[in-house]
C-alpha cells in the first residue's frame, strides 16, 4: 500500500493481503514481499542475494519505516527495510507521476559488515502482477534501423532483455521495454 497513512489500524482489513503461493494452495497463505531476499520461503527469484562474510546466503528484510513527499509532478514514497541478523539496509524509492501514469523506482543497498560481502543479485525493484496475460514490447536496432519495435505475448518462463555494450547500449540491443497487462501496449497504456 503506497497511499496516505491510514487513520485506524482496522482499515488494514480493507486490503487483500494474502495469496496462495502455489497454484494448488499447498503453501500457507501470505502476502507478497516488496523486495524479497535470498533464503526466505518465496519461490520466485529474489530481488537481492547477498553472501555475508560468514558464508550465510540468507537475507531476510523487515519493514522499518516509510515516508512520502511531493516531488515535481508526483509523489515519492520511500520504504526502509533492514535485515535483523546482519547490518544490511535497503531503501526502496517509488516516484509516481499520476498525469503520465508512470512509476519510477530504484533501490539503495547499504551493508556495514566488517568484511566484504558478495552480491550475486540486486534489483532496482520487484514487481508482482496478477493478470491472465502479459505482452512484451521491446526495441532492437542495427545500422540505419534504430529502435525497431517488436511485441509478443509472454509465455511461462524467464525473458531476459540485456546488453553488454555498456555506454553503447543504444547501438544494437536496447535494454528498454514496455509490458502490457491483459493486452498489448498502446500509446496510452502499458
Where are these regions (language model features)?
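Polysaccharide-binding surfaces and accessory modules of carbohydrate-active proteins
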Residues: 1-190
Amino acid at each position: 500500500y503506497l497511499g496516505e497513512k491510514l487513520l485506524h489500524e482496522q482499515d488494514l482489513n480493507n486490503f487483500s493481503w494474502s495469496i496462495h503461493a502455489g497454484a494448488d494452495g499447498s503453501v500457507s497463505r501470505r502476502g507478497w514481499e516488496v523486495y524479497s531476499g535470498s533464503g526466505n520461503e518465496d519461490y520466485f527469484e529474489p530481488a537481492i542475494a547477498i553472501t555475508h562474510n560468514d558464508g550465510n546466503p540468507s537475507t531476510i528484510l523487515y519493514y522499518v519505516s516509510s515516508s512520502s513527499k511531493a516531488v515535481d509532478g508526483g509523489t515519492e514514497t520511500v520504504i526502509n527495510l533492514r535485515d535483523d541478523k546482519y547490518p544490511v539496509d535497503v531503501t526502496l524509492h517509488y516516484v509516481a507521476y499520476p498525469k503520465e501514469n508512470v512509476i519510477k523506482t530504484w533501490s539503495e543497498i547499504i551493508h556495514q559488515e566488517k568484511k566484504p560481502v558478495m552480491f550475486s543479485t540486486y534489483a532496482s525493484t520487484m514487481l508482482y502482477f496478477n493478470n491472465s496475460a502479459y505482452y512484451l514490447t521491446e526495441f532492437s536496432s542495427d545500422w540505419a534501423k534504430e529502435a525497431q519495435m517488436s511485441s509478443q505475448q509472454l509465455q511461462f518462463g524467464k525473458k531476459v532483455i540485456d546488453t553488454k555494450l555498456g555506454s553503447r547500449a543504444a547501438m544494437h540491443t536496447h535494454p528498454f521495454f514496455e509490458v502490457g497487462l491483459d493486452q498489448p501496449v498502446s500509446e496510452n497504456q502499458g
